[in-house]
């Protein structure tokens, strides 16, 4: 089973280093050792949890329990929580971010109600949602954010690219 865990760590590490570079942050040493080192990436304002896949997938899913955990860990450190999930590519283009609405500069983006169905978790087709988002980018020429009522909070969903543009540029 060690081989599988090592392979998983390679994909996770690739994603974590990409996110850290984009948000001017650092990869948390020993990330995965939850109690001692919460989150995977941190900077001055955010504690970020990263989730990826070992194979390409069209399904993006944000799990409520993962959001609750990173949210609680971030609050205890006076940081904003963010959850990054990708489609297995560990790339900017394949990644989505869930964070609190107060964590982004809403004046720097166009806000829409999220068309996703939400039960306990937030899940959607990466390809379909990216197509809609790209059409909105072309129409409004600005970053796009989707407002989501999730675990009685107002959250926003953005592509990783839009998150970086709205928050870090």
Each model region followed by its residue ranges:
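Intrinsic disorder/low-complexity detector
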Residues: 8, 37, 42, 88-89, ...
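Catalytic centers of nucleases
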Residues: 2-75
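Catalytic cores of nucleic-acid endonucleases
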Residues: 17, 46, 52-146
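Charged phosphate-binding loop/patch that engages nucleotide di/tri-phosphates or the phosphate backbone
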Residues: 141-169
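A residue-level structural signature of the nucleotidyltransferase/glycosyltransferase Rossmann-like core
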Residues: 40, 95-96, 155-156
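Interdomain/boundary linker segments immediately adjacent to catalytic/signaling cores
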Residues: 1-15, 111, 115-121, 128-132, ...
């Amino acid at each position: 089973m060690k081989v599988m865990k090592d392979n998983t760590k390679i994909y996770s590490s690739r994603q974590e280093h990409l996110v850290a570079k984009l948000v001017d942050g650092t990869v948390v040493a020993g990330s995965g050792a939850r109690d001692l080192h919460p989150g995977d990436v941190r900077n001055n304002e955010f504690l970020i949890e990263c989730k990826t896949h070992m194979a390409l997938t069209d399904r993006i899913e944000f799990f409520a329990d993962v959001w609750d955990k990173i949210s609680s860990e971030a609050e205890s450190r006076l940081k904003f929580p963010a959850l990054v999930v990708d489609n297995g590519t560990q790339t900017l283009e394949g990644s989505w971010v869930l964070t609190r609405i107060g964590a982004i500069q809403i004046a720097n983006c166009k806000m829409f109600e999220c068309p996703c169905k939400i039960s306990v978790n937030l899940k959607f087709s990466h390809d379909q949602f990216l197509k809609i988002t790209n059409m909105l980018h072309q129409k409004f020429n600005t970053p796009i954010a989707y407002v989501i009522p999730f675990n009685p909070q107002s959250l926003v969903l953005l592509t990783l690219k839009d998150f970086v543009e709205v928050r870090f540029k």
